[in-house]
Structure formats: C-alpha cells, structure tokens
Amino acid sequence: MDEAFLQYTSLAYALTDIFGRGISISHTERLSGGDINKAYALILSNGKRVFMKANAKENAAFFTAEAAGLFAIASTGTIAVPHVLGAGTDDGEHVGYSFLLLDYIASGEKSASYWETFACSLAALHRADCTSFSSGKKFGFVENNFIGA
C-alpha cells in the first residue's frame, strides 16, 4: 500500500493536490452517522462532492488504519468500497483535526437483486485470499486497527 497520501498537513493542501489548484470548499453539509467521527459532504468549487470523516488531530491513526483496511478489501476485487482520496491532519482555525477523504457515494434505490448481489459479494470477500494483508493466516489484519472507529 502506498501511504504517501496519508501525509497531508492541511485539508486545503489535500484538496489542491488531489483536485488541482483553485479548488476550494463551496459548502459543507453535516451528515448523520457514527458516534466516534464527524461526517461531512464537502461540495467543492468544481461541483464535485467528497465524503470527509473528521476526528481530533491526535486520532489520525484511526484514518490511517481505515484507509489500509479499505485498500485491503478493494485488493480482493470482490466487493465495492469507496475510493480513498487522501487523509491527514489540519491545525484548523480554532482546533486541530484529522480527516479522511473518500469518494462520495450517493444513496439510491435498491434494485430487486440488491441483497442477493450483496450477499454473494460478501461471501466472495470472506473466501478471498487475504495472505497479503493478514498475519499469514486466514484471519487477523497485518496491523492493529480500531473497531468501530
């Protein structure tokens, strides 16, 4: 896994590096979800929507671990996961924070075959060869992570 993207020192720098010069946040929407992190939809000046999770600056390891897990799941080719755009920390105006940027996936209507397709994909994930990101067995991730983070 290439973790170079995890070294962003500000959200503004991350957005410029990922999307190009002149890109800024036009609007931020707070999203509901988990209890541990804050979730946002960032609407950028180019019209693109990005999903951002945020937490205290000292909890940046949450997002490093989550990105590693998403890369591992994606490497199996069995089930769709959001694309990791970047992660890092920002000193903020008043308080520092850590962040994880992902592709924004809009909710939609489930097709008639949604649950069957999901079940087959989930089963394929559990059958996948995970030795490249496990401790050499069929279980256990190669690095510690955070359940529920």
Model-identified regions with their sequence ranges:
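ATP-binding pocket architecture of kinase catalytic cores
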Residues: 29-149
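Juxta-kinase regulatory segment immediately upstream of eukaryotic protein kinase catalytic domains
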Residues: 1-23
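Short loop-beta-helix segment that forms the pyridoxal 5′-phosphate
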Residues: 26
